Amino acid sequence: MIILEQNNRIIVELLEQKFANAKEGGKPESVNVTFADFDGVLYKLSNPDGDRTKIILSISLKFYTELQQHGADDLLRRVYGGHMRSTPEQGFNVTLEYNLADLPADTTDLVQAASALKRNCFASVFEKYFEFQEAGQEGHKRAVINYRDDETMYIEAKADRVTVIFSTVFKDADDVIIGKVFLQEFREGRKASQTAPAVLYSLGEPPLELKDLPEARVGDNVGYITFVLFPRHTNKKTKDNTIDLIHSFRDYLHYHIKCSKVYLHTRMRAKTTDFLKVLNRARPEVKGEKKTFHGRTFQTQ
């Protein structure tokens, strides 16, 4: 299985290039790049007001207002400090600004933090409910994040656990079958590792935890994946790794479904080619009459 990168590769490469050029004393070059990420996220790297000595990175998330209810702004200010603009670029939710004339000697941490902007936006809601669990607080309203147009994430804290539920829509009947097989591997994985979180999967109807939500989607192509996170997954030492892995689980699942379909199609095409070769070798040659230059006929064997 492939673990998706937590840091956006385009941001890493562009910022490393621009920062290296600035530290070497090179002439600043203009940049204006817009690109997409999973979950409908949109990024933009550009120069503010045409000033090539500065670079701004902006992100747009359709569900950012829901994350703001769980402290997203405060967490981002804590992580990015003075690099976070008080007013984001028009059409975006968050904007970071970097002065190429005032860079630290080592820009590695700067680049890594910037390329994890989407992850850090997501982190606020997880950290909030992890803290509820650590303090033994129950009864807080369940967090509902509509991270895609037809898919939702639910988070709820208990005194001994945090439950994270993803609803996802399978576009194809084949995806449902492959998804079920794939998720069964998570259950098997827990048998091999007792420290892994419990993973439950239901198809068609929401799990019992969401029975009180009439808006929870129902349908043959709707799946619900439930993670039960215990204190060993949510404590201060392990929470960052947990957030890294779980916030992108939906993308991870569908990415592997697509990879599995590609693999199956490739194998099927290879088998078809092999069968055609066998059939061609087994095909009998057709006997036919041929004539010589003088009009005599003869049969080919």
Curated annotation (Swiss-Prot):
Gene3D superfamilies, per the entry: 3.30.1460.20
S-S pairs: none
Keyword Heme: no
Knocked-out gene: effects: RNAi-mediated knockdown suppresses the memory retention defects of the msi-1 os1 loss of function mutant.
GO terms for cellular component: Arp2/3 protein complex; cytoplasm
Subcellular location: Cytoplasm, Cytoskeleton
InterPro entries: ARPC2, ARPC2/4
Domain of life: Eukaryota
Main location: cytoplasm
A biological-process GO annotation: Arp2/3 complex-mediated actin nucleation
Keywords: Actin-binding, Cytoplasm, Cytoskeleton
Molecular function terms from GO: actin filament binding; structural constituent of cytoskeleton
Protein function: Functions as actin-binding component of the Arp2/3 complex which is involved in regulation of actin polymerization and together with an activating nucleation-promoting factor (NPF) mediates the formation of branched actin networks. Seems to contact the mother actin filament. Plays a role in time-dependent memory loss and the retention of conditioned behavior over time.
Record family assignment: Belongs to the ARPC2 family.
Name of the protein this chain belongs to: Probable actin-related protein 2/3 complex subunit 2
